[in-house]
């Protein structure tokens, strides 16, 4: 396992390449622009997919989510659609376009579920810092470095419970989904969440952890993975 990405050969190569082309060539996630977003593909409409939205609130009422579900306008395979859950859903939806969806549609297109927040911005930085990070060890600031105001972190177990017990079941309730092709993708803090979910969650079989944030205080998922029982993770990739 590396800090670059966790991918799989089980999903289509086209999907893997398309994700890379969409997000890394543009630098849209690595160098985010925090300006308000305009209409996205769900607002404009697609010739290949149809979109629905759901809204959720965290149990403490502090965070508010918007979840877009894109379903191919094509009958599912006998085993069901593959499904890809993507964190930072506002930024994802801003970059999706019909040319990309047409590429997916030409093969065995997945259902795409973009999990974002109820904001006009591409990222809710405070919410994702809490939702995507594990409980952190406290570190003193380096000598000569001013201490920054703390950002609330460490809530990924709470968010993962909302994701796996509420969002996923409600999203898939009326869809024919292949559970063996259920994937999750995240970048930076989102990649850290995916890395930790690989250790802890059994719902997903395929994990895309792209450039996970592994700073000094965020090493715990990677360190814990070094001593895992391989048998326990058979069937995950």
Where are these regions (language model features)?
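A domain-start/cap signature at the N-terminus of enzymes
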Residues: 28-81
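The feature captures the conserved acid-bearing segment of alpha/beta-hydrolase catalytic domains
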Residues: 211-237
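Residue in the alpha/beta-hydrolase core beta-strand immediately N-terminal to the catalytic nucleophile
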Residues: 183, 206-208
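Bacterial N-terminal signal peptides
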Residues: 16-24
């Amino acid at each position: 396992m590396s800090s670059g990405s966790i991918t799989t050969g089980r999903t289509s190569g086209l999907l893997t390449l398309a994700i890379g082309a969409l997000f890394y060539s543009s630098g849209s996630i690595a160098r985010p622009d925090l300006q308000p977003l305009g209409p996205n593909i769900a607002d404009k409409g697609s010739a290949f997919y149809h979109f629905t939205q759901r809204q959720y609130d965290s149990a403490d009422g502090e965070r508010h989510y918007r979840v877009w579900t894109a379903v191919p306008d094509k009958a599912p395979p006998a085993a069901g659609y593959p499904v890809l859950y993507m964190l930072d859903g506002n930024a994802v939806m801003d970059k999706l376009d019909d040319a990309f969806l047409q590429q997916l549609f030409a093969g065995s297109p997945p259902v795409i579920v973009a999990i974002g927040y109820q904001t006009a911005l591409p990222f809710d930085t405070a919410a994702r810092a809490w939702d995507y990070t594990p409980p952190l060890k406290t570190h003193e600031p380096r000598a000569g470095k001013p201490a920054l105001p703390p950002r609330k972190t460490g809530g990924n177990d709470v968010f993962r419970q909302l994701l796996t017990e509420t969002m996923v079941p409600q999203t898939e309730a009326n869809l024919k989904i292949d559970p063996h092709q259920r994937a999750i993708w995240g970048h930076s803090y989102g990649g850290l969440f995916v890395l930790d979910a690989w250790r802890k969650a059994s719902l997903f079989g395929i994990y895309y952890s792209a450039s996970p944030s592994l700073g000094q205080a965020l090493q715990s998922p990677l360190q814990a993975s070094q001593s895992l029982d391989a048998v326990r993770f058979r069937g995950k990739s």
